[in-house]
């Protein structure tokens, strides 16, 4: 396999790790309402687990309120139950036609817990990026050993993958800093 191809595959895989991290960060609660908070909340919709956004309209009319309007009004109870069972710590208010979720202010203690979660998720993403780098390094060494690439090309490839890794880790750190600031903002 060509070095360029290896590096391109590595970059694609690293970008997927970063996209996954962004998705994880979107579902972490801050003091503000966001429809992404409900992404992982699943309800039992006629026997199959479905995300809430596939059975209802979700809107954010105010910075600290989410309104869920199910298309099928009989699903209100199931949606309410799923939200209560989730780890979001939100209490749904039901008026018969829609569910209102008021996002309470986060306590200082809860903010610190959330920051720890942010750090852990960022660290997991860094580990994933480093594992991709290791895979490419191993592939380069294998190619060099098989004499399909020269020693100079292998060393050049190692330098390039390290630069790519450093850039992606920097990007992860920037995302982490933004999310941390968002969580700690009162």
Where is each model-derived feature located?
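A positional/architectural concept
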Residues: 2-77
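Short, intrinsically disordered, mixed-charge
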Residues: 23, 81-89, 120-124, 134
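Alpha-helix N-cap and coil->helix boundary residues
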Residues: 31-33, 94, 131, 135
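Flexible hinge/switch segments at interdomain interfaces of large molecular machines
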Residues: 35, 45-62, 93-97, 105, ...
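Glycine-rich active-site/cofactor-binding loop and its immediate structural neighborhood
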Residues: 64-92, 97
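Positively charged, low-complexity, intrinsically disordered RNA-binding extensions
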Residues: 99-186
């Amino acid at each position: 396999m060509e070095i360029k191809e290896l590096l391109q595959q590595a970059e694609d895989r690293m970008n997927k790790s970063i996209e996954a991290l962004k998705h994880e960060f979107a579902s972490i609660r801050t003091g503000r309402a966001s429809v992404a908070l409900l992404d992982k909340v699943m309800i039992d919709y006629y026997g199959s687990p479905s995300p809430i956004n596939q059975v209802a309209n979700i809107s954010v009319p105010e910075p600290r309120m989410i309104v869920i309007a199910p298309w099928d009004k009989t699903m209100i109870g199931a949606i309410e139950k799923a939200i209560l069972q989730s780890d979001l710590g939100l209490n749904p208010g039901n008026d018969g036609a829609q569910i209102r979720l008021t996002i309470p202010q986060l306590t200082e203690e809860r903010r610190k817990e959330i920051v720890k979660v942010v750090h852990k998720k960022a660290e997991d993403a860094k580990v994933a990026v480093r594992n991709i780098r290791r895979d490419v390094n191993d592939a380069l060494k294998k190619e060099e050993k098989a004499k399909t690439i020269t020693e100079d090309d292998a060393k050049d490839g190692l330098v390039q993958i390290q630069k790519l890794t450093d850039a992606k880790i920097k990007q992860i750190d920037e995302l982490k800093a933004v999310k941390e600031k968002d969580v700690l903002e009162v």
